[in-house]
Amino acid sequence: MYCCSAQDSKMDYKRRFLLGGSKQKVQQHQQYPMPELGRALSAPLASTATTAPLGSLTAAGSCHHAMPHTTPIADIQQGISKYLDALNVFCRASTFLTDLFSTVFRNSHYSKAATQLKDVQEHVMEAASRLTSAIKPEIAKMLMELSAGAANFTDQKEFSLQDIEVLGRCFLTVVQVHFQFLTHALQKVQPVAHSCFAEVIVPEKKNSGSGGGLSGMGHTPEVEEAVRSWRGAAEATSRLRERGCDGCLAGIEVQQLFCSQSAAIPEHQLKELNIKIDSALQAYKIALESLGHCEYAMKAGFHLNPKAIEASLQGCCSEAEAQQTGRRQTPPQPMQCELPTVPVQIGSHFLKGVSFNESAADNLKLKTHTMLQLMKEAGCYNGITSRDDFPVTEVLNQVCPSTWRGACKTAVQLLFGQAGLVVVDTAQIENKEAYAPQISLEGSRIVVQVPSTWCLKEDPATMSLLQRSLDPEKTLGLVDVLYTAVLDLNRWRAGREQALPCIQIQLQREICDFGNQADLPSGNGNKSSGGLQKTFSKLTSRFTKKASCTSSSSSTNYSIQNTPSKNIFIAGCSEEKAKMPGNIDTRLQSILNIGNFPRTTDPSQSAQNSSNTVANGFLMERRENFLHGDDGKDEKGMNLPTDQEMQEVIDFLSGFNMGQSHQGSPLVTRHNSAATAMVTEQKAGAMQPQQPSLPVPPPPRAPQAGAHTPLTPQPGLAPQQQSPKQQQPQVQYYQHLLQPIGPQQPPPQPRAPGKWVHGSSQQPAQAVGAGLSPLGQWPGISDLSSDLYSLGLVSSYMDNVMSEVLGQKPQGPRNNTWPNRDQSDGVFGMLGEILPFDPAVGSDPEFARYVAGVSQAMQQKRQAQHGRRPGNPRGNWPPMDDAHRTWPFPEFFTEGDGLHGGWSGAQGDSASSSDETSSANGDSLFSMFSGPDLVAAVKQRRKHSSGEQDTSTLPSPPLLTTVEDVNQDNKTKTWPPKAPWQHPSPLPSTLPSPSAPLYAVTSPGSQWNDTMQMLQSPVWAATNDCSAAAFSYVQTPPQPPPPPAHKAAPKGFKAFPGKGERRPAYLPQY
């Protein structure tokens, strides 16, 4: 149209431009093939405005070459027309080409890339068409502003200044069009191109590119939405990261200060910094409480935009961790390494993790086959022949921890973390199976759901710089997380990308570290209201009616301060969890524990409590009964050791049969018994009853664990359930949190557990869960020999001797009798009623009295010596001690009330784990050697090893003895002092006296107490209420106090409900 002159055309510029009116259009078409292509491509496209003008404009584009007489204006008009046409032709050509490719790649791994590119090209083409059709009238209007005759000017000198300005506006308009088109096209095409390269070229993705993995995509709209969700999450909880008046986060300020100063920080400045951190922590807690029951959701895929997630995490965690988050690499084949160890629900089939007598390959094969069958049910294989294993691998990779753990942790950090002050850690899960991932089929979609629970803790780096004691069990809050990945088989078949996994987060409302009775969710610890709560609860409780009982307990009982059970609650929680590992959701357990039920994790109990409430009620009642029964027994007098038992003690002390002790190392026995208990809910049930009586002490610790354990213990539980091997590393990883993991409870771990009420209770439980596996699995095992020696080999030896005397051989090299002996002594009356009576214990009342007196005297002496000895017992367990050295141990036992409550909790645990395991600890060993305690210890060990819950509670008497009795005994009685067990006075009332060991007779306990004290540091007793719970961590002394709490506990033995899972830590237990 611009080939002809203005006169020739007799048309104004506007009409000519719009019509593309060139008289020589036809000739030009022949000269330029491009317009032909343009017309061909535009036909199907038919954007009316664009097609005609564009085609004609393109044709005219070449016209000035053909025409001998051309002018600058005509050339410019023609050039603009050709340019706009070219944009449309280019877009149509590229769309047409990608469409051709995509039809060829239908079932290959290139199809996804071709389809993505085609979609983007169509979008760009439509945008270009709208842009060019809108710009042409604008250009025409501008050209009409040229001066008269400008179209015929041939020399630039002829153009007026106004003409130059008009042409300048045309130029800028064209530049703008050019820029907008290229920018828009790049924005749309670049991410798809990167995705294509990632899917098709990168070797790891070559074979899975067409499958549209659940997580592989570039900066597509899906990723952009994910980035928005990350930013939104961090902003939603920004009040948790309030900066000081200096604009800096308190924790970061402290860390930077210490890094920048080479000289020691002066005392006064250290004090100021501590005050600042206290203030920041208080503000954080208040802000956390103000968040309410909000549920949060965000997309995963943090590795797809490292810079965005790093920016979003500012203030939520350290800079180094933020950088690592986006660069976190998933192992190329996590399935082969991790899947065998992961219990998983596939459809209606629940497949456990690999067991010690099964090969990982067989386990993997079974899970893969089951997954394949589920997909075949969906008919996903119709027409699919190549790579039909891809969806199986893709889905199963989603349940591997390396795939979801990092994402879940990052999500929790985004919401609840504060750099330098609050860190996110895995909650200890003892019942790994309750948290098993679930893969289900919903139409053509395969849905993978992975529940997990995380805990918010004070940043240990900052706290250690400020020389603050840190309680590993203290948590600021618990967070439930549900990771959901969906693989749409139709999308996969079509080669389209899958949606990114979704992460749903909800803050648990039970924050018990301050001793507050935070309202824990009833049921599984999942919020009862809200979709996430229901889903999470459903997932985590599906394996366990037992588990439910735990949660119910949490809801029923929250008076941590008021009830021993509460104190126990912290310790008990973990213990119970440990015991329930097989059946109960860790969180549920913690909650139950919190609820103050000595949810002795014995599977049977959980099984019994199909309804949380019932379970709780059962636990509570049971505990009371046990306690009462025990008390009754105490009143009557404990069953005294028989001559045979005494002979055993003598043999033990004389070194006779020392070899056996090793064989029957308490660790192993307990482990097995625990495992057995876990495995057989029935056993657990039986144990539970025992536990309840013993639980009197255990309950307290259970609750404690509940409060804190849910966080830390859960991981422990999970490891337990997973497998001994897994358990070991996990235990080590969370050792400071759940040192008392059940399996670890064996001597080495037991000591550590002793510190942690949690741990100890957990340990028994873990032992149960993991106890199935060989001792070697236990993290504590490494220190087993030292533990045995530390314990003086006494504990294990005594266990062996006892088992032999009782006719119960140690279960195995590592099957110490302790763990197994369901020491019902702690259970006292209840155990007596439930379990066969041990003739050896009660046959000679006079002898029993003598032993009791000796035991009491010894304990009193110990109390005097170690009353508050913070770390002695711990000292015996190097792992524990070191782990918790930070805390002031003595403090733990200074609080009489808390102590005694804690003791209950801790004791139960410690009794079961710490005492047994490391009863050899100084006092324990000492008391053991000293006479009645020793006899009692032997006897109890025996019982434990036998796994029967004897009613006799000789060793326990000290625990049960009320402080008064103990004091009285100490003051007025010597050898014959009243057997502690004989004293019915409830320890709880007397226990409070801080000076008196919680259990006069339980000097071993007091040792443990000391340990606990060490643990008690403020951290331990996140709450004063929980201080007892903190004690429970100590677990050695816990036994005695618990009995006081429940009265039944007077015996000081925790019933080892889980067949030794929770062996009462009767004071002398070693």
UniProtKB/Swiss-Prot annotation:
Residues 719-742, 906-924, 951-962, 1046-1058 have a biased composition (Low complexity). The modification Phosphoserine is found at S723. GO terms for biological process: Rac protein signal transduction. It comes from the Eukaryota. Keywords: Cytoplasm, Phosphoprotein. Residues 692-702, 977-992 have a biased composition (Pro residues). It is found in: Cytoplasm, P-body. GO terms for molecular function: CCR4-NOT complex binding; small GTPase binding. GO terms for cellular component: cytosol; P-body. It holds the Pfam family DUF4745. Residues 681-771, 855-992, 1032-1070 are annotated as: Disordered. Its main location: cytoplasm. Acts as an effector of RAC1. Associates with CCR4-NOT complex which is one of the major cellular mRNA deadenylases and is linked to various cellular processes including bulk mRNA degradation, miRNA-mediated repression, translational repression during translational initiation and general transcription regulation. May also play a role in miRNA silencing machinery. Interacts with AGO2 and TNRC6A. PANTHER family: GRANULE ASSOCIATED RAC AND RHOG EFFECTOR PROTEIN 1, RIKEN CDNA 4931406P16 GENE. This is Granule associated Rac and RHOG effector protein 1. It comes from Homo sapiens.
